[in-house]
Amino acid sequence: WRLDVGDEISHFFWKRFRRAIKAVKKDMLIIGEIWHYAGDFLEGDEWDTVMNYPFYLNLIDLLADEKITVSQFIQNLGYLKGRLNKKCYPLMWNLIDSHDTARFLHLCNDNKKKQHLAAAFQLLLPGMPMIYYGDEFAMPGANDPDCRRGMYWDEEYQDKEMFEWYKQLLKVRKNHACIVEGEPLEIAARDGEETIVLTRKNDEETLALIFNCSSSARMFNEYAQKYDLLRENPFDGKIEGLDAAVIVL
């Protein structure tokens, strides 16, 4: 269940709603739409999670508007995580746009490399990715109602390179539980380089998730010759501008 504008209905109602839904199907997911802090709805007796608009807004500030640094981005997401029930954060619906916003690509002035990197954040950071239809083909769309235009089914208008990138991100996410469930070991956000490295570990493997938010290439020689899951090749130490890598340590 996705609950539109759910914060305009009382907590009393949602508590009763949850009891009724879970009585029918215990694993039914209850997702609220709310643009601001939603902790009071996520205490275990109302919703399971919400659409993660704070993630979206911070990603816009980082990549589209370039208003915050990579360390501010990480701090802001960490602050959100710290305020929420720890069981809710992995369920947060991470989005880069929706039926209520302009397409991410539009907000980036059609810079497809920025959407390329935004998709990596969306699919590799903790949370559940909510891919708005057409994003996987770099579909355009300004503010509502233009963002709700019909799906581009004609392959002539579909960006195949973007589609393959989404497929590869999803493949890596699906096949490596460490990305979803791994324990965070280290976060290195370097403002001067405009890079972020997140190290995660589970019982099976340790991964380094690398994000280059600069428009220029960056070197990560400490990971050279290790395996890059996104390229399915040994890593040469170089990440192009506005790109990402997932390295097996």
Predicted feature descriptions by range:
Residues I187-Y223:
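Carbohydrate-binding surface patches
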Residues Y223-N233:
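Solvent-exposed beta-hairpin/edge-strand motifs
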Residues D4-K87, F121, P140-Q168, K201:
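Active-site-proximal helices and loops of the catalytic beta/alpha 8
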Residues W35-H36, D100-T101, F137-A138, D203, ...:
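Short, glycine-/Ser/Thr-/acidic-enriched flexible segments
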Residues F235-L249:
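C-terminal beta-strand-rich structural cap/linker in extracellular carbohydrate-active enzymes
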Residues I68-V70, E181-P184, I210-N212, P234-F235:
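A conserved amphipathic helix/loop scaffold
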Residues L80-I179:
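Active-site-proximal substrate-binding groove within the catalytic cores of carbohydrate-active enzymes
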Residues W1, I30-G32, M51, N94, ...:
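Hydrophobic faces of well-ordered beta-strands that scaffold small-molecule active sites
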